[in-house]
Amino acid sequence: MYDPPFLEALMITASFFAIFIIIVVSVLLLEGD
């Protein structure tokens, strides 16, 4: 019922989402400064 490929895909998606958020926050800080 619970397969590892789903967990691996979730980790990959989470890592990409984290990188995206970091980039957005960096841009907002640079624009705000």
From Swiss-Prot:
| Record-level GO cellular component terms | membrane
Keyword field contains Transmembrane: yes
Membrane topology field: Single-pass membrane protein
Q: Keywords of this protein's UniProt record, alphabetized? A: Membrane, Transmembrane, Transmembrane helix
Q: Where in the cell is it found?
A: Membrane
Which source organism? Salmonella choleraesuis (strain SC-B67)
Q: Which domain of life is it from?
A: Bacteria
Descriptive protein name = Uncharacterized protein YoaI
Transmembrane stretches, start-end: 10-30
What gene is this protein a product of? yoaI
